[in-house]
Amino acid sequence: MAAHHRQNTAGRRKVQVSYVIRDEVEKYNRNGVNALQLDPALNRLFTAGRDSIIRIWSVNQHKQDPYIASMEHHTDWVNDIVLCCNGKTLISASSDTTVKVWNAHKGFCMSTLRTHKDYVKALAYAKDKELVASAGLDRQIFLWDVNTLTALTASNNTVTTSSLSGNKDSIYSLAMNQLGTIIVSGSTEKVLRVWDPRTCAKLMKLKGHTDNVKALLLNRDGTQCLSGSSDGTIRLWSLGQQRCIATYRVHDEGVWALQVNDAFTHVYSGGRDRKIYCTDLRNPDIRVLICEEKAPVLKMELDRSADPPPAIWVATTKSTVNKWTLKGIHNFRASGDYDNDCTNPITPLCTQPDQVIKGGASIIQCHILNDKRHILTKDTNNNVAYWVSVKDAGFSSPDGSDPKLNLGGLLLQALLEYWPRTHVNPMDEEENEVNHVNGEQENRVQKGNGYFQVPPHTPVIFGEAGGRTLFRLLCRDSGGETESMLLNETVPQWVIDITVDKNMPKFNKIPFYLQPHASSGAKTLKKDRLSASDMLQVRKVMEHVYEKIINLDNESQTTSSSNNEKPGEQEKEEDIAVLAEEKIELLCQDQVLDPNMDLRTVKHFIWKSGGDLTLHYRQKST
């Protein structure tokens, strides 16, 4: 992802423009998968994670390619998803601070809720009431009626919400029973807080955990709650008694994910130690190690197509999602106490997953080299790649000087070239009238920057620098009526200046001093402070030295012998550059400069000190 940002003086808000360099279709999860939802009716699995994309997969094992579609609108991690309305609607929560409502069958975003002020970390769903709750790092819990959310339109886009207040710390987990009568939240406060969503009343606070509560589950009638914590324990709570009635020490490290069967008799747990256990809640000595993943477990989803569940889907900090069979899981016996003796380790029920949804690699490190063209990256597969931002065209060097271009401005024009407001009609009014009279009025609209284009599928994101997203769209969609209207409201003035008014920002100037080198024996000049664009190449300074300093000295020495002829008049302008490079050397810190360098490079990589840049010149020895 690349970005440009400026201060928006109108709203006193810093607006950042970002874009994503990617393939048109991103079929693979590119990082850890935070959330899973299974639609057994359509045999579809929804995955969402750290690459901001929600993907739909077929879980039919007979399909060679399980990928179905991607749902893209978020601009940061997707932390949780829930399927509602019998699989027709999907709700998602993201670190971009939004909650989004999706048509799960057609795969498009229907509406965006911007009530939260920080990362939205967890969702909870009451199936019988079609009620969803969202919570996050802003310590707020909001309640949403799903039927109201799905009825929102461009003209009818107002929605009311109830909120549950009282949390003192960031919320990382949330649960609501199917009847919609109880909500429980878990946070870094290390307690469970309980509300009645019907009245928004606080009911109780449950203490017992010693670290962040990362996972919560409620039984159907809301009388019992299971919690998993970074303290490594699973606790069973009686809400009627308002106390913990059982503690299960199954894992060696933090418990981050829980699932439970419909009868609320067996809990499936996973976490930082990469192990997935099934524990009998009625007899905690009866537990089985189902499998061991290759990375910490973030989320699990039971296949509830039968009872007992035949399989469980597991997502980890890696991009691959695995399905593990649960056949034969209830044929095990008590395994003794919970102290996992390393000399007698428990054998996993499964050593290989039953089905694999393969993920892709993601870039985890990058370094831009000094030439600002080449980049080194390292991905999650430990592959190091060497990239170049601009390919050599293979043409010979053109005659004359290179044009001065602002690549950032050209890029902004390319990103918004489909936005009608940026289009320019070069015909003046008189030409328009003549062509109209002659019946020759033609479409001569100029789009883009005239140099290059970006792929139409490129995502463009406007957002507050270091904060929330204001608007996201694909390049090709900026011509749409709705998108154009939103761009008019969102695009900051500094981008308007470049893309609509075609006013490129002025080049930065660098002040410098120009003096003869000590070895030249020339008299030191009056120390005049010069300035030039930081993009100015060293060869241009050499031309200045040759034409304005060396040539003037030669003229004064040869005036009597040359009569009315002057060397400067005899030389063609294009020859000056060649002669300057043949006869002049420019130095900084006693290092001879490459004529292709620009002043910015000289200042940052050779001068390397405070104060104004000082350059020295001398004539090459013949």
From Swiss-Prot:
Residues with the Phosphothreonine modification: T558
Start and end residues of each stretch annotated as Disordered: 552-573
UniProt key word Metal-binding: no
Regions of compositional bias (Low complexity) in chain numbering: 554-565
One GO BP annotation of this record: positive regulation of double-strand break repair via homologous recombination
Record key words, sorted: Acetylation, Cytoplasm, DNA damage, DNA repair, DNA-binding, Endosome, Lysosome, Nucleus, Phosphoprotein, Repeat, Ubl conjugation pathway, WD repeat
One Pfam family linked to the record: DUF3337
Modified residues annotated as Phosphotyrosine in this record: Y28
Chief location category: nucleus
One cellular component (GO) term of this entry: late endosome
Record's keyword annotation contains Repeat: yes
Highest taxon in the source lineage: Eukaryota
Mapped WD repeat ranges: 28-67, 73-112, 115-154, 166-205, 208-247, 250-289, 292-334, 358-397
InterPro entries: G-protein_beta_WD-40_rep, WD40/YVTN_repeat-like_dom_sf, WD40_repeat_CS, WD40_repeat_dom_sf, WD40_rpt, WDR48, WDR48/Bun107
GO molecular function, one term: double-stranded DNA binding
CDD domains the record matches: Ubl_WDR48 (cd17041), WD40 (cd00200)
Family under the similarity heading: Belongs to the WD repeat WDR48 family.
Function description: Regulator of deubiquitinating complexes, which acts as a strong activator of USP1, USP12 and USP46. Enhances the USP1-mediated deubiquitination of FANCD2; USP1 being almost inactive by itself. Activates deubiquitination by increasing the catalytic turnover without increasing the affinity of deubiquitinating enzymes for the substrate. Also activates deubiquitinating activity of complexes containing USP12. Docks at the distal end of the USP12 fingers domain and induces a cascade of structural changes leading to the activation of the enzyme.
Quaternary structure (record): Interacts with USP46. Interacts with USP1. Interacts with USP12. Component of the USP12-WDR20-WDR48 deubiquitinating complex. Component of the USP12-DMWD-WDR48 deubiquitinating complex. Interacts with PHLPP1. Interacts with RAD51AP1; the interaction is direct and promotes formation of a trimeric complex with RAD51 via RAD51AP1. Interacts with ATAD5; the interaction regulates USP1-mediated PCNA deubiquitination. Interacts with RAD51; the interaction is enhanced under replication stress.
Domain notes per entry: The WD repeats are required for the interaction with deubiquitinating enzymes USP1, USP12 and USP46.
The name this protein goes by in its record: WD repeat-containing protein 48
Organism: Macaca fascicularis (Crab-eating macaque)
